[in-house]
A protein has these predicted regions:
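Beta-lactam-recognizing serine transpeptidase/beta-lactamase-like catalytic domain environment
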Residues: 26-39, 44-98, 103-300
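Conserved, well-ordered alpha-helix/loop/beta-strand core segments that scaffold catalytic motifs
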Residues: 1-34, 39, 43
Length: 300
C-alpha cells in the first residue's frame, strides 16, 4: 500500500524527531546541571501487517533515502553512521522488552500455571534468589518505591508489571517460554521474499553456545520480560501481534500477491494465504491478552 507506506514514513520520522527534541533538552540540562542524561535516537522501524492474512502493508525503516538519487549519493549513504541503507524492519534485531509479556502471559494461561482471575500481591522486588546475589525489581519499585498491588494477568499486561512475570515466569521455565515464542514466530523466518534475519529467543543452549557461560535462573526471569539474549525483528513483532489479534494464527508475511504474463493478459500465479503455525489453545486466552494490551493505551 504505497499511500500507507508514505504516511508511515512521515509518522515515524516525525515521532523520532519529536523524541529527539525532548532528548536534546535533557542532554543540555545534564551538561549544565550534572543530572542524568540520555542518548539521541539514531533509527527506528515501523511495520503494519494485515491481521487476517499476515500480509505486510507498510515496512518502514528510518533514516531512509531517496531511491531516485541513491546511485549518485551511494558513497555518502554508505558512510553515514546512522546507516540509512540498513533495513531495520527486516534486518534489525532488538530486545522486545515488555512487548514480549503477552507471549509469556499466553504460556502461563495455556499451561494452567495461572487462571485469568488468579491474583498476585506484587512486592516490587523479587527476592527468591537474593541469597545468590540476584533480586530484580519492578520498574515502578525502582523508580518510585511503589508496587502494583494485587493484580491479575490482564492488569499485569496493562501496567507492565515486571514482578508478576518474574514470579510466574520462574515457575513456567525457559523451555515453555521459548516454545510459545516459536509458535508466535518469534526468532523464526516470517516468509517474506526479502532478506531478513531471525534473531533469537533466549535459551539455555543459545547462551552457553555463544558465551560459554552457564544459564542461571535470573536469565529465565529476564527472558520473561523480553530481556536477556532475546532479540527479534520489528516485522516478527508485528506478525506476533497480528496472531494475538486474530486468535492465534501466524501467517506468512509474503509480499508477492500475483505473477502476470508480460502483457498482463494472464495471471500465472495467485498467492493464497499461508498458515505457518497456530496456537491450538483455549480461544478465550486471546481475549484476556487483547484486553490487557488494550489497557496499555486506555487504562494504564
Amino acid at each position: 500500500d504505497i499511500g500507507l507506506q508514505e504516511v508511515c514514513e512521515e509518522a515515524l520520522a516525525a515521532h523520532i524527531e519529536s523524541i529527539n527534541e525532548e532528548r536534546a533538552r535533557i542532554i543540555a540540562e545534564a551538561e549544565m546541571y550534572g543530572t542524568e542524561s540520555t542518548e539521541m535516537i539514531s533509527g527506528g522501524a515501523l511495520c503494519v501487517v494485515k491481521v487476517d492474512t499476515g500480509e505486510p502493508l507498510a515496512l518502514v525503516s528510518y533514516p531512509t533515502y531517496d531511491a531516485a538519487t541513491m546511485l549518485d549519493n551511494y558513497e555518502t549513504l554508505v558512510a553515514d553512521e546512522n546507516a540509512p541503507l540498513y533495513n531495520r524492519a527486516l534486518m534489525g534485531v532488538y530486545a522486545p522488552g515488555s512487548t514480549f509479556k503477552p507471549c509469556t502471559a499466553t504460556a502461563l494461561l495455556a499451561e494452567g500455571i495461572i487462571s485469568p482471575t488468579r491474583t498476585l500481591k506484587t512486592e516490587g522486588q523479587f527476592t527468591k534468589y537474593i541469597d545468590d546475589g540476584y533480586a530484580p525489581e519492578c520498574w515502578i519499585y525502582s523508580t518510585y518505591k511503589y508496587t502494583h498491588g494485587e493484580i491479575n494477568v490482564v492488569q499485569a499486561i496493562t501496567y507492565s508489571c515486571n514482578y508478576f512475570f518474574y514470579y510466574f515466569g520462574d515457575e513456567l521455565g525457559i523451555d515453555k517460554m521459548a516454545y510459545y515464542a516459536k509458535l508466535y514466530g518469534l526468532g523464526e523466518h516470517t516468509g517474506i521474499e526479502l532478506p531478513e534475519v531471525t534473531g533469537q529467543m533466549s535459551t539455555q543452549s543459545f547462551k552457553e553456545q555463544y558465551t560459554g557461560i552457564s544459564w542461571f535462573q535470573g536469565d529465565t526471569l529476564q527472558s520473561a520480560i523480553g530481556q536477556s539474549f532475546t532479540e527479534f525483528t520489528p516485522l516478527q513483532m508485528a506478525e506476533y501481534c497480528a496472531a494475538i489479534a486474530n486468535g492465534g494464527t501466524r501467517h506468512s508475511a509474503s509480499i508477492l500477491k500475483e505473477v502476470r504474463s508480460y502483457d498482463y493478459s494472464k495471471t500465472l500465479f495467485q498467492r493464497e494465504t499461508e498458515v505457518l503455525s497456530k496456537l491450538d489453545i483455549d480461544p478465550e486466552i486471546f481475549g484476556y491478552i487483547q484486553y490487557g494490551m488494550y489497557g496499555v493505551l486506555y487504562d494504564a
